[in-house]
Swiss-Prot record:
Belongs to the LacAB/RpiB family. One of its GO terms (molecular function) is isomerase activity. GO terms for biological process: carbohydrate metabolic process. NCBIfam families: PRK05571.1, RPI_actino, rpiB_lacA_lacB. Its EC number is 5.3.1.-. This is Putative ribose 5-phosphate isomerase. It comes from the Eukaryota. Pfam families: LacAB_rpiB (PF02502).
Length: 163
């Protein structure tokens, strides 16, 4: 019996000036992938654009929250700043991952919608491979991890209500 094909994902892609070349390379690499239905580029588009990473990360994460895209790929120098920023949007789970196992578990264990790379940390060929693998994973709402992800969401709601 053949496996059910995975539905294609709507992606956002974002970077600061430290991630422009990887963003462009990854966007080109993913644009022909059948698991991608669309890519929304929220910038930046040039190394001369000094828009700080929090702005583009929040913009891309908000697209997920608003249901306009399914996931986002973000690149900065380390991948850490964009992840921290994206995680400020309620309901968003962003991770920085530079290896196969972490990319897999980001989806299967944590239902992370955002994958972040550091252009100064990871080679472009590995980034392309990991981004391609990332597209093949889907979170199982019936998995043992679902309760843990729900606990994260519950805590988030609790703290949002308090503040």
């Amino acid at each position: 019996m053949a496996a059910t094909p995975l539905p294609p994902l709507r992606l956002a892609i974002a970077c600061d000036d430290a991630g422009v070349s990887y963003k462009e390379a990854l966007k080109a690499h993913l644009s022909d992938n059948p698991l991608v239905s669309s890519i929304t580029d929220v910038g930046v588009t040039s190394t001369t654009d000094k828009t700080a990473y929090p702005h583009v990360a929040i913009q891309a994460a908000q697209l997920i929250k608003d249901g306009k895209v399914d996931r986002a790929l973000m690149i900065c120098g380390t991948g850490l700043g964009v992840a921290i920023s994206a995680n400020k949007v309620p309901g968003i789970r962003a991770v920085t991952a530079h290896d196969t196992f972490s990319v897999e578990r980001a989806i299967l264990s944590n239902d992370a919608q955002v994958l972040c790379f550091g252009q100064r940390v990871i080679g472009i060929e590995l980034a392309k491979r990991l981004a391609g693998e990332w597209l093949t994973y889907r979170f199982d709402q019936k998995s043992a991890s679902a309760q843990k992800v729900q606990a994260i969401s519950d805590y988030e709601k609790k703290f949002v209500e308090v503040n």
